[in-house]
Amino acid sequence: YKLGGYNMAKTTFSGPVYSKNGFINTGPGMTISLTADTDLTVAAHAGRLLLTNDADGKFTLPTINVNSNSSVAGDTDYDNLNNIGATFNFYVETAATDMDILTDGTDKFKGVILTAIDDGAKKAFYPAAANDVITMNGGTKGGLVGSVVTVTAIDDDKYLVHNSLLLGTATIAT
């Protein structure tokens, strides 16, 4: 990592980190343009704004790991792959035609997505227990430019969908 003119190594804290004046994440690495089908990773994509620029893209979230301790290290190990709390923020920059945000098939979505259309109609979508795909088509299922979806790994096999608004046209479908 670069800090000023200095390189800063990755640092792992095992206890809480307090900032009395906040953390500000800025710079060119804070947005990533997704221009093709992408298998997302925590290291490259979590906590960043993911600009979806593939109208029929398939963006696959990483498998949720709740306990990834190695045989020689524990919860505070730098190489522990536990990804609970990893958040993925999507912004539709190119209107969807058949765009999917999907899990590995084992992880499922919980939470709600609000879909709104230009005549003021809106509809909330609550995923079924088996739901592992969010599909946008730029019309009845949302996905127009400006749509946003946020998902966070919250537990074994569970991604929370929150702070999400899909913009669409015509009669809303779920």
Residue map of PLM features:
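Short linear motifs centered on Gly/Pro in flexible linkers and helix caps
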Residues: 3, 33-35, 128
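Extracellular disulfide-bonded cysteine-rich modules/repeats
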Residues: 145-153
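Short solvent-exposed loop/turn micro-motifs enriched in small/polar/acidic residues
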Residues: 10, 142-144
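Exposed extracellular interaction/assembly regions and N-terminal maturation sites
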Residues: 12-121, 156-174
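Beta-strand-rich interaction surfaces with strong enrichment in secreted/lumenal proteins
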Residues: 75-77, 136-140
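Short, charged, surface-exposed secondary-structure boundary motifs
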Residues: 122-126
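Short, Lys/Arg-enriched N-terminal segments with co-localized hydrophobic residues
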Residues: 1-7
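A conserved acidic, glycine/proline-rich C-terminal tail/linker
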Residues: 128-138
